[in-house]
């Protein structure tokens, strides 16, 4: 058994670590609330664009954007969303596991993959595994803007429009609740042709375009793809802060239990030392 002095040092070290994890837990909780607010604020924008596209697609059934064209898959693209920092549990591990699994399935079918990656954690992992990266982005911070993400989005959209890839998957985490974040693989391109609901069809109206319809529809389609990726990034940020808060709370709780165990060991060591001293004194007195 370690002596009392060593145990006292361990207790001090664990208590200092617990102070750090408690502080990180509180910071993550604050950032999580702000990230959730941004996530909720962005949803209506993407939903409204989808709704407008549904109206326009119904009014102009002949319209087909290059990002909607379906063709046989010979090469795939991935837009992968991860975090810049760690200490967020298995959030990045789950996303990257989905990427590797999907790439392996495609490879078995003879389909190669190009990747655009957001976040240092994904970049480091995929570089080590020899993945073909065509775009990368890191350092978005806690308040990302759409303009910061245009590079990876355009890289994948342009590659699809030029026929360099035949399908693009968006891999990120979806926020279910504070305790649960689910890694998902969703098809980003080709965009499924928007359809109007029965209610929308009943209230269908025509639009007057200036100067003409196609540029408006083309721009809306680009904005829709951008909004889907932006929503995924800010939702992943909310997942990151939630996962970090839970991980730091778990670390703090474990540290508290460790301090309790060490305190018990310290008391036993101290009691054993006192008992030994008394025994030595008694033995010395008896010898005299």
From Swiss-Prot:
Claim: Transcription is one of the keywords in the record: no
GO biological process, one term: proton motive force-driven plasma membrane ATP synthesis
Gene Ontology cellular component annotations, sorted alphabetically: plasma membrane; proton-transporting ATP synthase complex
Subcellular location: Cell inner membrane
Membrane topology field: Peripheral membrane protein
SUPFAM superfamilies, per database record: ATP synthase (F1-ATPase), gamma subunit
Gene3D superfamilies cross-referenced by the UniProt entry: 3.40.1380.10, ATP synthase, gamma subunit, helix hairpin domain (1.10.287.80)
Statement: the UniProt record of this protein carries the keyword Transport: yes
GO molecular function (one): ATP binding
Pfam families: ATP-synt
Keywords of the record: ATP synthesis, Cell inner membrane, Cell membrane, CF(1), Hydrogen ion transport, Ion transport, Membrane, Transport
Function as written in the Swiss-Prot or TrEMBL entry: Produces ATP from ADP in the presence of a proton gradient across the membrane. The gamma chain is believed to be important in regulating ATPase activity and the flow of protons through the CF(0) complex.
Subunit relationships: F-type ATPases have 2 components, CF(1) - the catalytic core - and CF(0) - the membrane proton channel. CF(1) has five subunits: alpha(3), beta(3), gamma(1), delta(1), epsilon(1). CF(0) has three main subunits: a, b and c.
Record-linked NCBIfam families: ATPsyn_F1gamma, PRK05621.1-1
Family: Belongs to the ATPase gamma chain family.
Listed name of the protein: ATP synthase gamma chain
Species of the source: Acidithiobacillus ferrooxidans (strain ATCC 23270 / DSM 14882 / CIP 104768 / NCIMB 8455) (Ferrobacillus ferrooxidans (strain ATCC 23270))
Lineage, broadest ranks: Bacteria, Pseudomonadati, Pseudomonadota, Acidithiobacillia, Acidithiobacillales
